[in-house]
Amino acid sequence: MRYVASYLLAALGGNSNPSAKDIKKILDSVGIEADDERLNKVISELNGKNIEDVIAQGVGKLASVPAGGAVAVSAAPGSAAPAAGSAPAAAEEKKDEKKEESEESDDDMGFGLFD
């Protein structure tokens, strides 16, 4: 992704055909080392293409990907509601879940992926 972003920065900055040297210069400016193999792959794929057309094609492809809405799950016919005696057990399970969540958040030092 960093190579594509650097290529786009160079192209939008007026360089219609950025070279590996141009992209390395952009990456070096923010302290990122460039992998020549990946860099050359990005350049060979994007070389000579109109950036606006590539972006439009990407947007079209992303539009066809499902965006993960909630799936409705209905209860099976004839299934009974839980008995009233199971309510304390459910509350106890929630306490256990909350305790486990707090332990998990310590693993990522408070920086969760979806926070």
From Swiss-Prot:
The modification N6-acetyllysine is found at residue 21. The keyword RNA-binding does not apply. One of its GO terms (cellular component) is cytosolic large ribosomal subunit. Residues 76-90 have a biased composition (Low complexity). The modification Phosphoserine is found at residues 19, 79, 86, 102, 105. GO terms for biological process: cellular response to cAMP; cellular response to Thyroid stimulating hormone; cytoplasmic translational elongation; positive regulation of translation. Pfam families: Ribosomal_60s. InterPro entries: P1/P2_N_sf (IPR038716), Ribosomal_P1/P2 (IPR027534), Ribosomal_P2 (IPR044076). Residues 91-101 have a biased composition (Basic and acidic residues). Plays an important role in the elongation step of protein synthesis. HAMAP family: Ribosomal_L12_arch (MF_01478). Heterodimer with RPLP1 at the lateral ribosomal stalk of the large ribosomal subunit. PANTHER family: 60S ACIDIC RIBOSOMAL PROTEIN FAMILY MEMBER, LARGE RIBOSOMAL SUBUNIT PROTEIN P2. This is Large ribosomal subunit protein P2. It comes from Rattus norvegicus. The gene is Rplp2.
